[in-house]
Amino acid sequence: MQVHKTLAEHCGMMPPFAVFQSLPMTPSCTLASALQSLQQQFIAMPPVLSMGIAVDGLHDGALRLRAPLQANVNDKANANAFGGSLASLMTLASWGWLTLQLQLAGHHADVYVADSQLRYVAPVYEDLVANAEPSELGSWEAFLATFRQRGKARIGMRAQIALGSGAAAATLSGRFVAFPKR
């Protein structure tokens, strides 16, 4: 797992007092510990465990997950990735992004996928790499304000499985919702 930033760095290098004022958290709540917690959540889900998913960190604001092709092949003789694995990895990347951000913001929430639309563009013959982020710039801030005010919120997410060339093999567009843990 690659961890590139501390929480303060992740929050745009705000002065320490600004981070602690805007994010109720403990000093031990770093991006590294939040990413490790997310990996443990994935390991605790038997279907996800069988996919061999690894959290690869935040890259340009997007959560990156990886999974080996060998654990996610379909029934075809040419052994390309199973479409269900592509859908699962993109859904988990989107769910994971929102879960991670809520944890970093000091909230313990249950996150659910409300709906999603998938598009399969090309077969995948290599290890799977998914990136997920909000569909609209600034939507995280609006989501967080709504969550704090109403105790629930939804956000549009987009995810992509990229080929080694960088071209999209599959895309997901979906809405995810969060409620406080009970």
Regions found by a protein language model. Give the residues of each.
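Short Pro/Gly-enriched beta-strand edge/turn motifs at strand-loop
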Residues: 33-41, 48, 140-142
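Catalytic strand-loop segment that frames the active site of acyl-thioester-processing enzymes
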Residues: 50-81
